[in-house]
Structure formats: C-alpha cells, structure tokens
C-alpha cells in the first residue's frame, strides 16, 4: 500500500488546509493500525501500558493508569497548519474526539488511601506539534523530509466526561476522606480533568509525530507538498 503514493497521500499546497485535511485523513485511514515494516505505529486504537498523573497536589490526588486504550485518533482533522519554509519549521494542530478506557488506581497520597477500578474518559481535544524539518537527498537523489524533534501541546475543549465503574464510584462516594475533600475537588474539577486528559494526549501525539517522521522517510517530499523544494 505504502509504495503507491497516490493511494497514501494527495500532494497539497502548504496553504490549502482543506487539501491537507483530506490527505491526512487518507493517510490515517490507511495506516492507523500501524505498518511495522515501515516503523509506523498503531494509533487507533492506541495502547499505553501505564501512566501516572499527579492530578491535584493540594489533596494528594494521583491517578495511576494502566492498560489505556485510546480510540478516535484516526478521525482527527487538521485545525491549523503553518509551514515556515525560511526557518524550516512546522506548526500542526489537529482536533479529535477521543474515548479513553483504562484501569485506574486513584490515590489520595496524603491519606495513604487507594481506590481501584475502571475509568472512561470522553473528550474533544486539540493536539499540537511544533517541529523543525530539513530536506535531504537520498542515495538516488530524491528529496525527503527529515523531521526534527517535536514539542507537543494539548488543549481540552470543554470539560472531559469522566465515568467510573459502579464499585469504584460507590467506594469514593462513601469514604470519609473523599467526602472531606469533595468541595475542594469540585472547585477544581474541570482543570483536574483537563490536565489529566492532556497528559494522556501528549503521549498519543508523540506517536502521531513519530508516524509523520516515519512516512517522511519512505515517500519523497513531492508526495506531500506541491510548493516545497
């Protein structure tokens, strides 16, 4: 599939966001499950084995996630794309509706208490990546993009919807320490949820940029853009 450039990408002007969105969607549909022989990682579903998030230090709230299963990245849409051909830098932002399911241990470190269960998060996000690039000739004189180190950003659109399995929700509801902290938690709930979600998203977008880097090694620069040389 990847040897057929026309099937993988539609070359676009760097100014044509509609074309870039179509081309990105085409690539994601082809490669979202990963292509190991080209070092393209699966991103939908994207699996993260474990992640610890210090969610709110004031009450010692820590989320210990395991077996995170993230879906929705294959349907991400470009919301912003800026390419500076003089400085050879790219700003890419995409919007996606994500669904996250994970085993979780919710720790209240100040009380030495933990509660285990399953968490489901649903949210709309904007993930961003800034990276440098260069154009390099391969052994046959064909130009390829070489993608530099990325800086990842994340924005949660509104408040993420969070659901816990009934046993975990019931345990948190009845525990005296969680009852004591509930008012403080509720006052900061939106920012806690957004910050925790973005820690997950940032790991996801490392793989998204990795795949951009990987496919740039396979295809010539002309497979991506009509106005970069």
From Swiss-Prot:
Does the keyword Amino-acid biosynthesis feature in the UniProt annotation? no
Q: Where located?
A: Secreted
> SMART domains in the record, alphabetically?
JHBP
Q: Does this UniProt record's set of keywords contain rRNA-binding? A: no
Coiled-coil features, chain-numbered ranges: none
Which InterPro entries does the entry mention?
Answer: Haemolymph_juvenile_hormone-bd (IPR010562), To_sf (IPR038606)
What does UniProt give as GO cellular component? extracellular region
Which domain of life, per UniProt? Answer: Eukaryota
Sorted alphabetically, the keyword list is:
Secreted, Signal
Function as written in the Swiss-Prot or TrEMBL entry? Prevents juvenile hormone from being hydrolyzed by general esterases by combining with it specifically.
Descriptive protein name: Juvenile hormone-binding protein
The source organism is: Manduca sexta
State the encoding gene. JHBP
């Amino acid at each position: 599939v990847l040897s057929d450039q026309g099937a993988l990408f539609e070359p676009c002007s760097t100014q044509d966001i509609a074309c870039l969105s179509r081309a990105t969607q085409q690539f994601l549909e082809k490669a979202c499950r990963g292509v190991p022989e080209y070092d393209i990682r699966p991103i939908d579903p994207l699996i993260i084995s474990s992640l610890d998030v210090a969610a709110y230090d004031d009450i010692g709230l820590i989320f210990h996630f395991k077996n995170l299963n993230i879906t929705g990245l294959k349907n991400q849409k470009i919301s912003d794309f800026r390419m500076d051909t003089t400085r050879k830098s790219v700003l890419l932002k995409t919007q996606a509706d994500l669904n996250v399911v994970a085993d979780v241990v919710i720790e209240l470190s100040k009380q030495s208490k933990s509660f285990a269960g399953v968490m489901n998060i649903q949210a709309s996000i904007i993930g961003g990546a800034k990276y440098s690039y260069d154009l390099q000739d391969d052994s046959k004189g064909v130009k390829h993009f070489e993608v530099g180190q990325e800086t990842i950003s994340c924005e949660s659109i509104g408040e993420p919807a969070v659901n816990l399995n009934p046993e975990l929700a019931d345990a948190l509801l009845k525990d005296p320490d969680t009852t004591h902290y509930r008012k403080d938690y509720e006052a900061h709930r939106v920012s806690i949820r957004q910050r925790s979600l973005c820690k997950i998203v940032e790991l996801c977008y490392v793989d998204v940029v990795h795949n951009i880097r990987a496919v740039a090694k396979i295809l010539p620069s002309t497979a991506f853009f009509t106005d970069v040389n």
